[in-house]
């Protein structure tokens, strides 16, 4: 990590790290598995650590994305309110918030869709919320 670039051969991890560095704002989403983010999302975050924060010798992380805004999105098959009571979605949001926070992103909102197994599409209410959050990302 001394160079700020992963030493593994060039792959999607390197490409994602570059995208994080180039972005002005971020919309990040994951399905909920066992009360947390998907394994693919966790692996991606593990691979892009050098692009998200610097780790000086004193051990205190230095966020590399201060001033950038982010929206978090989750979906799970567990119906509300059990998705909240059983900490399905809250565990996922907490994990993403912690990673993005240490990286310097300001969370401007979240979208949570529970009970997806029985849904035939995205409810209009969620589409409206998505538009409002997009405006929050675009307008400081």
Describe each model-derived feature in a short phrase.
Residues 2, 60-61, 107:
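Glycine-rich, flexible loop/turn motifs
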């Amino acid at each position: 990590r001394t160079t700020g670039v992963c030493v593994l051969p060039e792959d999607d991890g390197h490409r994602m790290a570059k995208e994080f560095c180039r972005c002005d704002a971020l919309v990040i989403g994951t399905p909920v598995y066992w009360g947390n983010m998907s394994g693919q999302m966790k692996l991606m975050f593990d691979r892009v650590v050098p692009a998200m924060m610097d780790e000086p010798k004193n051990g205190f992380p230095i966020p590399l994305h201060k001033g950038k805004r982010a929206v978090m999105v989750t979906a799970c098959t567990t119906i509300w309110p059990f998705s909240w009571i059983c900490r399905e979605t809250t565990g996922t949001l907490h994990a993403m918030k912690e990673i993005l926070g240490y990286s310097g992103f300001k969370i401007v909102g979240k979208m949570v869709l529970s009970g997806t197994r029985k849904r035939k599409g995205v409810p209009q209410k969620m589409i409206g919320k998505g538009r409002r959050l997009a405006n929050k990302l675009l307008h400081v």
